[in-house]
Design a protein with these regions (language model features):
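Short alpha-helix capping/helix-loop boundary micro-motifs
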Residues: 1, 23-27
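Extreme N-terminal tail/first-helix region
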Residues: 1-7
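Conserved hydrophobic positions within beta-strands
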Residues: 15, 38-41
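A structural micro-motif recognizing beta-strand termini
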Residues: 18-20, 53
Length: 78
């Protein structure tokens, strides 16, 4: 496992855990970003920009360090 802020552009991962302040966790959930979602990193320079459920999101690297993910390597892991 790794943290979201450690992924690079083009990486694909599954969200395992979101360990943030309650208000940030609520914002993630209300935006449709939940444990089990598959994400694709669009850019990891500055903010982390990623795609989840056909939507694009941007979060700070500071917030991204609280999101635990498993990097997916093979297509069949999706």
């Amino acid at each position: 496992m790794t943290m979201l802020n450690q992924l690079k552009s083009g990486d694909i991962a599954r969200i395992i855990d979101i360990d943030c302040e309650p208000e940030f966790t609520k914002k993630f959930i209300s935006s449709g970003i939940t444990e089990g979602n598959i994400i694709r990193i669009i850019s990891s320079f500055g903010s982390i920009i990623f795609n989840v459920n056909s939507r694009i999101f941007s979060i700070s690297k500071g917030l991204a360090k609280n999101v635990r993910v498993i990097k997916l390597i093979y297509q069949h892991q999706l």
